[in-house]
C-alpha cells in the first residue's frame, strides 16, 4: 500500500525543479513516518539534479538533510514515538550483512547502499525520493534521534555537512596539538571549522576570498590565509598536520599538499565532477597522504548529533521557501549563502 505526498522534483537534467506528487509506502512494522519540517540543500543535490556524476534517475526528488517530527510508528518500533524529533541523512537502508554494516559503517556497504534519493529500494525497481517533500517513511534503524536542544533548522544540515566533516576528524583523531587547514568556506567548510576548533585543534581557514576572513574567525578559525597570496602560502609550507578539503569545484591539489608537514594528511570530502591530477613528488618528499571520507554510519551520525547538542554546534543557515529552490541552486554555485540553504517544508504544504 502507498499514499501520495507533495514534493518538488527535477524532471530532467536541464529542467527547473517544480511541483511533483510521489508515492510513499505505508508504515511497516519497523518503520517511522516523519512529517518533514526542514530539509537542507547540499551541493551534491545540484550535481545529481544536473547529472554531473552521470548516474541520475528522473524524475528526481533531492534532499538528504531531513529533519522533522514523527507522525506514525510501526508496531515493532522501539526507539521512536509520535512527536519525537527525527532526522534522515544520506541513506535509508543497506544490506545489513556485510562486515561494514556489522561495524556500523553502513555508508561503505559492500552489497548495495540504499541512498535517500536518486536510487532504488531493495526490489531494484522502486525509486527513492528525498526530503524536498512533505513526508518520508524510513526504517527506524536508519532514522536518527535529534535533541530538542538543537535549533531544528540548524540541525538539518548536520545530517550531511555535519557528519561528512565530523567522521574524518574523529577517524584521524584530530585534536589538541594538531594544526588543521580547512579549504573552502561553504556548507562543509564552515562545519569543519566549527568541529575542528571544538576538538581543540589550531584551525586555519584557506580561502580565495578575503571577505571571508571575519566570518571564518567568528566560526572558530584561529588564522586565515588567502590562497591567492603566494607569499602567505609559502609561509605555511610544511605546516599542517591535516587539511580538510571541502571544495567541489576543480582545483590544484599541489598548491595545498605542499602546506602539509611530514606525514600530513589531506582529507578530501568535496566531490569535484572531474578527475584531479595528483603530483607524485608532493606526496613522496614528505610522506604525505591524500585520503577520502564519505559521510558516516548510523552510530557515528547519532554520536555526532549528540556531540553537537552537548556543545551547542549547529549549521549557519538561510531559510527559504521551496518555491525559491532553483534560484537557491544558482546562489550556491556563486558561493552566495552563509552557509547552508534550508527549505521550510511548510511552504510546500500550503
Spans of model-derived segments:
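Adenosine-nucleotide cofactor-binding segment
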Residues: 176-185, 195-255
Amino acid at each position: 500500500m502507498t499514499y501520495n505526498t507533495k514534493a518538488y522534483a527535477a524532471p530532467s537534467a536541464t529542467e527547473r525543479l517544480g511541483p511533483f506528487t510521489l508515492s510513499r509506502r505505508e508504515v511497516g512494522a519497523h518503520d517511522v513516518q516523519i512529517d518533514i519540517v526542514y530539509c537542507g540543500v547540499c551541493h551534491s543535490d545540484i550535481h545529481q539534479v544536473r547529472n554531473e556524476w552521470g548516474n541520475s534517475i528522473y524524475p528526481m526528488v533531492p534532499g538528504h538533510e531531513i529533519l522533522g517530527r514523527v507522525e506514525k510508528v510501526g508496531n515493532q518500533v522501539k526507539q521512536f514515538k509520535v512527536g519525537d524529533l527525527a532526522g534522515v541523512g544520506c541513506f535509508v537502508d543497506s544490506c545489513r550483512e556485510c562486515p561494514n554494516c556489522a561495524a556500523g559503517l553502513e555508508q561503505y556497504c559492500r552489497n548495495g547502499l540504499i541512498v535517500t534519493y536518486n536510487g532504488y529500494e531493495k526490489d531494484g525497481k522502486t525509486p527513492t525520493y528525498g526530503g524536498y517533500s512533505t513526508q518520508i517513511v524510513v526504517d527506524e534503524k536508519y532514522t536518527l534521534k535529534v535533541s530538542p536542544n538543537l535549533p531544528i533548522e540548524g540541525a538539518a544540515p548536520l545530517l550531511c555537512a555535519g557528519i561528512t566533516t565530523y567522521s574524518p576528524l574523529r577517524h584521524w583523531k584530530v585534536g589538541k596539538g594538531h594544526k588543521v587547514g580547512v579549504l573552502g568556506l561553504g556548507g562543509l567548510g564552515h562545519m569543519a571549522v566549527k568541529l575542528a576548533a571544538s576538538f581543540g585543534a589550531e584551525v586555519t581557514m584557506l580561502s580565495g576570498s578575503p571577505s571571508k576572513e571575519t566570518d571564518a574567525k567568528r566560526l572558530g578559525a584561529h588564522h586565515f590565509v588567502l590562497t591567492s597570496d603566494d607569499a602567505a602560502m609559502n609561509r605555511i609550507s610544511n605546516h599542517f598536520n591535516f587539511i580538510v578539503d571541502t571544495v567541489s569545484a576543480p582545483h590544484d591539489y599541489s598548491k595545498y599538499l605542499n602546506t602539509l608537514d611530514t606525514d600530513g594528511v589531506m582529507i578530501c570530502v568535496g566531490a569535484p565532477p572531474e578527475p584531479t591530477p595528483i603530483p607524485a613528488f608532493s606526496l613522496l618528499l614528505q610522506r604525505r597522504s591524500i585520503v577520502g571520507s564519505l559521510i558516516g554510519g548510523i552510530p557515528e551520525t547519532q554520536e555526532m548529533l549528540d556531540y553537537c547538542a552537548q556543545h551547542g554546534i549547529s549549521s549557519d543557515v538561510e531559510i527559504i521557501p521551496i518555491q525559491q529552490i532553483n534560484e537557491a541552486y544558482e546562489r550556491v554555485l556563486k558561493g552566495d549563502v552563509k552557509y547552508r540553504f534550508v527549505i521550510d517544508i511548510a511552504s510546500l504544504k500550503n
